[in-house]
Amino acid sequence: MEKETLLYEGKAKKLYFTDDSNVLWVEYCDQATALNGARKEQITGKGALNNQITSLIFEKLNAEGLETHFIKKLSKTEQLNKKVSIIPLEVVLRNVVAGSFAKRFGLEEGIVLEEPIVEFYYKDDALDDPFINDEHVKFLNIASDSEIEFLKKETRKINKILKKIWTEIGLTLVDFKLEFGRLADGSIILADEISPDTSRLWDAKGQHMDKDVFRRNIGDLIETYTEVLNLLEKTK
C-alpha cells in the first residue's frame, strides 16, 4: 500500500489517498482542540495515543461483527481506513448526565440515565455544531427515516460493547460521540475515531480520564491518555 497526496486535513487528523481508491491512509496529529476549535494547542504524543487507543477499540468492534471503516494500524500514528463519505452528523449517546447535557437541562453531573439517550448534532463549525432532531435531519437531506433509525440502533449496539470494554478496565462510559460514513455502494458504517477525545470516561473516584482534563484544565492530557492506553492493552 502506497501513501499518496493529501486529501483532507482536519483538527486532529490528516487523510491521504493511497494506490487503492477505496482505502485512505490516516495520520493522527498532536493538536488538541476545545470549543469547536476555538482553543488549540500542540501536545506532543497526543496523536500516537489516540491512534493506538482508537485502533484497539475498533479491533474489538470489528471482532464483534460491527461494520467499521477500520482496516489496520500501520504505526503509532497511522492507520488504514476504508474510504467513506462522512455523514455530517455527530451522533452522541449519553449514559450519565454530564457536560452540555447537564448545562442544557440545569442538571447536576453524575445522574445515571434510566435509558441511554441518543442525540444528533449537525456537523458545521461555522454554526457551532447545533443540536438537531430527526425532522431537521430529514429536512437537511442528511439521512432518511430508515437511515436515522439505523444510526440510533447501531449507536445503541455500539454503546453496549463499549460499556463492556470500559467497565473491564474500571472506567464508566459517561457519553461518547460517533460519526458514520457511506461506502461507495451507499451502505452506512462506523467511521472516525473512538478515543478519550470523543468519549467522556470517569474512573471509580469520579476522576476524568478524557479530554475534559484539557477542556477544564484539571489534569495532564498525556498522562491521562497514557493510563487509558495502558489499561486497554492489558485486555488484548
From Swiss-Prot:
Pfam families: SAICAR_synt. Its EC number is 6.3.2.6. It comes from the Bacteria. Pathway: Purine metabolism; IMP biosynthesis via de novo pathway; 5-amino-1-(5-phospho-D-ribosyl)imidazole-4-carboxamide from 5-amino-1-(5-phospho-D-ribosyl)imidazole-4-carboxylate: step 1/2. Keywords: ATP-binding, Ligase, Nucleotide-binding, Purine biosynthesis. One of its GO terms (biological process) is 'de novo' IMP biosynthetic process. The keyword Mitochondrion does not apply. GO terms for molecular function: ATP binding; phosphoribosylaminoimidazolesuccinocarboxamide synthase activity. It is an enzyme of class 6 (ligase). InterPro entries: SAICAR_synt/ADE2_N, SAICAR_synt_PurC, SAICAR_synth, SAICAR_synthetase, SAICAR_synthetase_CS. The keyword Kinase does not apply. Belongs to the SAICAR synthetase family. This is Phosphoribosylaminoimidazole-succinocarboxamide synthase. It comes from Lactococcus lactis subsp. cremoris (strain SK11). The gene is purC.
